[in-house]
Curated annotation (Swiss-Prot):
It is found in: Nucleus; Cytoplasm; Endoplasmic reticulum. GO terms for cellular component: cytoplasm; cytosol; endoplasmic reticulum; nucleus; ribonucleoprotein complex. Belongs to the RRM IMP/VICKZ family. SMART domains: KH, RRM. It comes from the Eukaryota. The third and fourth KH domains are involved in RNA binding and self-association. Stable self-association requires RNA. RNA-binding protein that acts as a regulator of mRNA transport and localization. Binds to the RNA sequence motif 5'-UUCAC-3'. Preferentially binds to N6-methyladenosine (m6A)-containing mRNAs and increases their stability. Mediates the specific association of Vg1 RNA to microtubules. Binds specifically to the vegetal localization elements (VLE or VgLE) in the 3'-UTR of Vg1 and VegT mRNAs. Binds to the Vg1 and VegT mRNAs in both the nucleus and the cytoplasm. May regulate mRNA translation. Acts as a transcription regulator. InterPro entries: KH_dom (IPR004087), KH_dom_type_1 (IPR004088), KH_dom_type_1_sf (IPR036612), Nucleotide-bd_a/b_plait_sf (IPR012677), RBD_domain_sf (IPR035979), RRM_dom (IPR000504). This is Insulin-like growth factor 2 mRNA-binding protein 3-A. The keyword Transcription regulation applies. GO terms for molecular function: DNA binding; mRNA 3'-UTR binding. Keywords: Cytoplasm, Developmental protein, DNA-binding, Endoplasmic reticulum, mRNA transport, Nucleus, Repeat, RNA-binding, Transcription, Transcription regulation, Translation regulation, Transport.
Length: 594
């Protein structure tokens, strides 16, 4: 994506004019400017410089009386499903952007691009060409919080004609696009890379992300990069110092890719370098260790009533604080964990903190691998559940045996059945879920592809309200996930408290015994597998549809897994009934159950 199209050119513009413009703007280019009637093409050294040219010149520079437009040059055959959206308000919530994009079709992937501009840039992959075309037409020039969006095609490698054998190899890659929110990434591997689908990927590592005061960045890099090279060699790590991010900011992020031991060793060396530089420059303020962690993992790091964090503080003799949820924006899905103490205790605290974060990540990967098998085709990375600094969720087949290999999926082309789930939320949270004039619940419904209704309160003193969600499994996953997230964002659960909600699903009364199992065996296995509390209340009177309630209580992943496993049991019961009916109709004797 380093080839540029320069449009809206005057007839008088020459290659020399464009060369001078790029040189004045300090944007390097390779080769010659190919000037046609009213437009031109040129190559930049890499994608970063191409983005810089677009940010600096497009719509901002006049040449021979005309304001030029600069965008990625995309061959017609590759103008398919991928768009780049620029000039997004920097403090826009993901939820708003998601709902806007979803109005024009199914979004498979949405990833932020690092730029030096104040506004945000994302690359979006729609499910098909028509959705992308509508998105381009409707969103280009769209006014969002006084910012005018700029939308262009970017090359879709998967649109390039291929041999049938190549297409077969690459289909799994399409189903598992790279991580959705690419904060701090240098860009994912191309989805069309030869052999990418056939070659197994290594287990994804969780890098260590630090914040360091800007004045110490030079000392960490060293003369001509000597110090940083020495650190990487000593610790067998790859270290990225994001100097261009947040120009003028007092702190800069550093990403360390290595084994847990390598990350910790590099972190300790960096702390020692900063301390020495502070002494040499008579810098008297305390320099705490600041670790960046994706918000999804912070609740588990803190633990119930803050127990995990208190234990780390006591064991390492440090003082640890975590930035508030309100600081999270489109640019920043990470919380800052500040550790105060001398170098040795801080280094020990880093090890314990990252150990907890890695455990949470691995647990989520395991849970989501199971989820991916239970909801075929579900694009988990598109929901933003994983930290951007990792490469997203690996395909379920990589290194993890399918725990549900016997699951029967709907026939090809058949839509998954709609389900109804009752989710109970704090009564005080109803306003936040509905939003001003119902805007939030409408956006959520569109994004998830589900019907979402709030049931009337059971009484004036009711502490809980029931949210009725109707839709297929993927819609349930999206809608429930967003509701869990909204409750945490709006502080209906404390900063040291994990969001656990009660969910009710109805099952036919004749199938309740299958959910419970002999002597409660099935329900106990369900609870062990999912970490959710699953209860089928005894002595229930079936409703008018001959159904009874199964109650599930747990955090989001636990609840989702329990719901999927119960639906799987119900599907098995239905299949057996259908088989028995066919057998009865054909007059054949029924096979004896073992």
């Amino acid at each position: 994506m380093n080839k540029l199209y320069i449009g809206n050119l005057s007839e008088n513009v020459s290659p020399t004019d464009l060369e001078s413009l790029f040189k004045e703007s300090k944007i390097p280019f390779t080769g010659q400017f190919l000037v046609k009637s009213g437009y031109a093409f040129v190559d930049c050294p890499d994608e970063t410089w191409a983005m810089k040219a677009i940010d600096t010149l497009s719509g901002k520079v006049e040449l021979h009386g005309k304001v030029i437009e600069v965008e990625h040059s995309v061959p017609k055959r590759q103008r398919s499903r991928k768009l780049q959206i620029r000039n997004i308000p920097p403090h826009l919530q993901w939820e708003v952007l998601d709902s806007l994009l979803a109005q024009y079709g199914t979004v498979e992937n949405c990833e932020q691009v690092n730029t030096e501009s104040e506004t945000a840039v994302v690359n979006v992959t729609y499910a098909n060409k028509e959705h992308a075309r509508q998105g381009l037409e409707k969103l280009n020039g769209y006014q969002l919080e006084n910012y005018s969006l700029k939308v262009t095609y970017i090359p879709d490698e998967m649109a390039t004609p291929q041999a049938p054998s190549q297409q077969l190899q690459q289909q799994p890659q399409q189903q598992h696009p790279q991580g959705r929110r690419g904060f701090g990434q240098r860009g994912p591997a191309r989805q069309g890379s030869p052999g990418a689908a056939a070659r197994p990927k290594p287990q994804t590592e969780v890098p260590l992300r630090m914040l360091v005061p800007t004045q110490f960045v030079g000392a960490i890099i060293g003369k001509e990069g000597a110090t940083i090279r020495n650190i990487t060699k000593q610790t067998q790590s790859k270290i990225d110092i994001h100097r261009k991010e947040n120009a003028g900011a007092a702190e800069k992020p550093i990403t360390i890719h290595s084994t847990p031991e390598g990350c910790s060793a590099a972190c300790k060396i960096i702390m020692e370098i900063m301390q020495k530089e502070a002494q040499d420059t008579k810098f008297t303020e305390e320099i705490p260790l600041k670790i960046l962690a994706h918000n999804n993992f912070v609740g588990r790091l803190i633990g119930k009533e803050g127990r995990n964090l208190k234990k780390i503080e006591q064991d390492t003799d440090t003082k640890i604080t975590i930035s508030p949820l309100q600081d999270l924006t489109l640019y920043n899905p990470e919380r800052t964990i500040t550790v105060k103490g001398s170098i040795e205790p801080c280094a020990k605290a880093e090890e314990e903190i990252m150990k907890k974060i890695r455990e949470s990540y691995e647990n989520d990967i395991a849970a989501m691998n199971l989820q991916a098998h239970l909801i075929p085709g579900l694009n988990l990375n598109a929901l933003g559940l994983f930290p951007s600094s990792s490469s997203g969720m690996p395909p379920p087949s990589v290194g993890v045996p399918s725990p549900t290999s016997s699951t029967s999926y709907p026939p090809f082309g058949q839509q998954p059945e709609s389900e109804t789930v009752h989710l109970f939320i704090p009564a005080l949270a109803v306003g936040a879920i509905i939003g001003k004039q119902g805007q939030h619940i409408k956006q959520l419904s569109r994004f998830a592809g589900a019907s979402i209704k709030i049931a009337p309160a059971e009484g004036p003193d009711a502490k809980l309200r029931m949210v009725i969600i109707t839709g297929p499994p993927e819609a349930q996953f999206k809608a429930q996930g967003r509701i869990y997230g909204k409750l945490k964002e709006e502080n209906f659960f404390g900063p040291k408290e994990e969001v656990k909600l009660e969910t009710h699903i109805k099952v036919p009364s004749y199938a309740a015994g299958r959910v419970i199992g002999k002597g409660g065996k099935t329900v106990n296995e369900l609870q062990n597998l999912t970490s959710a509390e699953v209860v089928v209340p005894r002595d229930q009177t079936p409703d008018e549809n001959d159904e009874v309630v199964v109650k599930i209580t747990g955090h989001f992943y636990a609840s989702q897994l329990a719901q999927r496993k119960i639906q799987e049991i119900l599907a098995q019961v239905r299949r057996q009934q259908q088989q028995q009916q066919k057998t009865v109709q054909s007059g054949q004797p029924q096979p004896r159950r073992k």
